[in-house]
């Protein structure tokens, strides 16, 4: 048919007609589509022939390549208005399925807040506001927020969006952890803080350094206190054992004070009101004058059981004895304490007037096996484990129902 209409030459080339009525500089190329079966070889380049006057100047000879056409009969060739590429679109597809409409839809979705950047900001805000949270908590809240905003979405699309949101939340949490903005321990997520500049970071590190130095000092003080307690207890045990060997009998029961204990010291003229709970686990003392409280460790120190390490006045012989009472790893600390570097470890406090000092049974109950011979020298100051309770004399408070008055004075 094409040959009959003189559209194809005998050698199979395609004729191209140029409108002779237009100006020479604006040649118009007219392309006539031919059924693929009439063309022998696909991909063969066709050189068009021009018909017209010889004196007409044509700007450029056009070379047309025959594209690969699909085998389906219901397809048409669509040319992009922006690019020279050729796209094959089925006639059964809607116009929204074109690549340009898909790109618009993707950009619109990103603007609606479905991008990783937007999710990262949302996740960061929620973790910062909560302080401590979990992945499920953040993901559930974001799913609820976006589901409420998209009520018109179909159920199957909503399920897909929920999975997408949870995946985005998981990715955002990993990004924030990599940037050290949040920390994760098992299922618990904690807020650390946004990155700061170098000056602020240096200041924060200096504050953290001072805080850790203070903790180290506190730990050193606790260690030295425990070393003194161990030395004092072991010295007391050795002294009691020697006393039993010399007497060849155990001491009388009424001469033994069990550890731990406390001693309350006050004037003979002080009026003391002591109330004891029904279970005898709590004691309430009311004093009308100043008083002092000493614990067992302070009494042992004043008896010389700590070998003078508490004050830094330790002789070479006492140092040797003290080093033998502690493990090998603690011997350097004992030597350091003997040289006087223990200053400031123990707090020396004095008693004061009190009204309503409450003592628990743990301070008065029988504890470690050990016997103590009391010293005749009275103590005026206390360096106990805890600071002395301080209060002032005031009006007498009504006794609680669970206390029984005991008028005995110590």
Swiss-Prot record:
Modified residues (Phosphoserine): 23
Ranges where the record places region Disordered: 79-114, 370-410
Keywords, sorted A to Z: Acetylation, Activator, Cell cycle, Cytoplasm, DNA-binding, Nucleus, Phosphoprotein, Transcription, Transcription regulation, Ubl conjugation
Extent of Acidic residues compositional bias: 394-410
Keyword presence, Nucleus: yes
Chain segments carrying region Enhances binding of RB protein to E2F: 211-327
Motif DEF box positions after renumbering to this chain: 161-195
Name this protein carries in UniProt: Transcription factor Dp-1
Organism: Mus musculus
């Amino acid at each position: 048919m094409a040959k009959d209409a003189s559209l194809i030459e005998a050698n199979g080339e395609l004729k191209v007609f140029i409108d002779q009525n237009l100006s020479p500089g604006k040649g118009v190329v007219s392309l006539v589509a031919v059924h693929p079966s009439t063309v022998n070889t696909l991909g063969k380049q066709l050189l068009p022939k021009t018909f017209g006057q010889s004196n007409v100047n044509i700007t450029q000879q056009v070379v047309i390549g025959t594209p690969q056409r699909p085998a389906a009969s219901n397809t048409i060739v669509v040319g992009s208005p922006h690019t020279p590429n050729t796209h094959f679109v089925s006639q059964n597809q809607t116009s929204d399925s074109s690549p340009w409409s898909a790109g618009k839809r993707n950009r619109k979705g990103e603007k609606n807040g479905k991008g990783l950047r937007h999710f990262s900001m949302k996740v960061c805000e929620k973790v910062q506001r909560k302080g401590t949270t979990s992945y499920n908590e953040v993901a559930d809240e974001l799913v609820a927020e976006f589901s409420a905003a998209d009520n018109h979405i179909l159920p199957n699309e909503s399920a897909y969006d929920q999975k997408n949101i949870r995946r985005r939340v998981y990715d955002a949490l990993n990004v924030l952890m990599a940037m050290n903005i949040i920390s994760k321990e098992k299922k618990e997520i904690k807020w650390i803080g946004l990155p700061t500049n170098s000056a602020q970071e240096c200041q924060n590190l200096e504050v953290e350094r001072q805080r850790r130095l203070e903790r180290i000092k506190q730990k050193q003080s606790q260690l030295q206190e425990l070393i003194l307690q161990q030395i004092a207890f072991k010295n007391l045990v050795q002294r009691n054992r020697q006393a039993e060997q010399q007497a060849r009998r155990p001491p009388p029961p009424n001469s033994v004070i069990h550890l731990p204990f406390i001693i309350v010291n006050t004037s003979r003229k002080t009026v003391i009101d002591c109330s004891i709970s029904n279970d005898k686990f709590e004691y309430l003392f009311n004093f009308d004058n100043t008083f002092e409280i000493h614990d067992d460790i302070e009494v042992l120190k004043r008896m010389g059981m700590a070998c003078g390490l508490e004050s830094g006045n330790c002789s070479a012989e006492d140092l040797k004895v003290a080093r033998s009472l502690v493990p090998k790893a603690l011997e350097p600390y004992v030597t350091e304490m003997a040289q006087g570097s223990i200053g400031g470890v123990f707090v020396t406090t004095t008693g004061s007037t009190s009204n309503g000092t409450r003592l628990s049974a743990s301070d008065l109950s029988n504890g470690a096996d050990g016997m103590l011979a009391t010293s005749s020298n009275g103590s005026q100051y206390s360096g106990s484990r805890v600071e002395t309770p301080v209060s002032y004399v005031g009006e007498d408070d009504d006794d609680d129902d669970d206390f029984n008055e005991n008028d005995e004075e110590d």
